[in-house]
Design a protein with these regions (language model features):
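Short, surface-exposed loop or secondary-structure junction motifs
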Residues: 59, 66, 118-332, 337
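Bacterial N-terminal signal peptides that target proteins for export
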Residues: 1-9
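N-terminal signal peptide c-region/cleavage motif recognized by signal peptidases
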Residues: 16-18
Length: 386
């Protein structure tokens, strides 16, 4: 009898381990059957996928970081994440508000006096962070190459719409927010990101400028004809699309958004600000950096919210007054691309579930969303409305 009682805990532990191992194997097979065909269809050299579910992190790596030396992708491979940098920039701006350095209601001119007399002088920092300043374009014109030409561009810019009435997705818009947030903290943007925000989030291998010692981990992106690419320098590139990171760090950021309780109070408040809804654009609610949808959500609705029209065209926007705090059932997401990289992240707080997909090929957003939605469905059978 004594022996039987002693073996019971061991047996239960073995059964529990077997159950976890089976769940891991099932998840591995679901991710494999989604990612491998995706890579084949779009000629993607390498991908890193990271999933957090019920507090557990899972990592899945495919292909190579570099075609020349066939270095395998790992969870430590550094990828360019393009505009998936924007939620990090937004978190910095929200942290600047949480620590009393600025408020999102401030005008751009309050923090950049050189804008005095321009159409952007009275645009709010919230307008800049939600792409509602009146129609700033996706990219700067080619002749904006230095701080002087950037200021000249902002000073002569003419709005298409009254501020706060339309959303036009824009690097010069949120890029200015990031620049002014860092300025309010008294440091250059790369310094405050690498020296303060990344460490506070536990992102120990995330960079604006990849240090020499980390270059062996930095993947090459690839063009459609498999020529190696790295992001091209440009004005406010760091603020709008400049983060290089790995799957582990990006999953930590997603986990911080799912469960910020372990972070300092100012950072908790900042993350809540990025989840707040400020404008409604169709079925999407624009937060700071993150874009929010009611959950569950169909594949078609999620693809529509990440369509070329949403990235390239002005869309009517309805201001939410007061701003709308995070509903109980929401999905947050953001895509990101550079010339040779494609990234995507989503998380669903009510399901304690998050996903990061990093690739060294800029492939269509619709394909990223389809793959992510398939994995989401494997984890939550109610992910799509019935």
């Amino acid at each position: 009898m004594y022996a039987k009682l002693n073996t019971l805990p061991a047996l239960l532990a073995l059964l529990a381990f077997g159950s976890v191992a089976h769940a891991d194997d099932t998840l591995q097979s679901r991710v494999d059957e989604t990612i491998r065909p995706l890579m084949a269809e779009h000629a993607i050299a390498g991908m890193a996928v990271a999933i957090t579910y019920n507090g557990q992190a899972h990592y899945f790596n495919y292909g190579v970081a570099r075609l020349d030396d066939q270095q395998p992708v790992s969870s430590d491979t550094l990828f360019e994440i393009g505009s998936l940098s924007k939620p990090l920039t937004a978190t910095l701006a929200a942290l600047a508000q949480a620590t009393g350095k600025l408020t999102l209601a401030d005008s751009a001119g309050q923090h950049w006096p050189e804008l005095q007399g321009s159409k952007l002088e009275h645009a709010s920092l919230l307008n800049l962070g939600t792409y509602t300043a009146g129609g700033l374009p996706l990219q700067f014109p080619d002749n904006v190459t230095d701080p002087a030409s950037m200021l000249a561009y902002y000073r002569q810019w003419q709005p298409e719409h009254i501020a706060g009435t339309h959303r036009r997705y824009s690097n010069p818009s949120i890029g200015m927010l990031g620049m002014l947030a860092a300025k309010s903290m008294g440091q250059p943007f790369p310094t405050v990101m690498e020296g303060m925000l990344f460490p506070a989030l536990g992102m120990s291998h995330s960079y604006i400028q990849v240090p020499t010692a980390q270059l062996p981990r930095y993947a090459f992106g690839y063009s459609k004809d498999n020529q190696p690419l790295r992001v091209t320098p440009g004005m406010l590139d760091a603020e709008a699309y400049g983060v290089k990171t790995n799957a582990r760090d990006m999953l930590r950021f997603v986990q911080a958004n799912l469960n910020p309780a372990g972070l300092n109070k100012d950072l908790q408040r900042a993350i809540a600000m990025t989840h707040t809804g400020y404008y409604r654009v169709g079925e999407m609610t624009q937060g700071l950096g993150w874009e929010r949808y009611p959950y569950p959500i169909s594949l078609e609705r999620l693809q529509a919210g990440n369509s070329p029209a949403m990235a390239l065209e002005s869309q009517p926007a309805t201001r939410l007054a007061p701003p709308e705090s995070e509903p109980s059932d929401s999905l947050f997401n953001k895509t990101g691309s550079t010339g040779g990289f494609g990234a995507y992240a989503l998380f669903v707080p009510s399901q304690n579930l998050g996903l990061v997909m990093l690739a060294n090929k800029n492939y269509p957003n619709s394909a990223r969303i389809k793959a992510a939605h398939a994995i989401l469905n494997a984890l939550d059978k109610n992910a799509a409305p019935h």
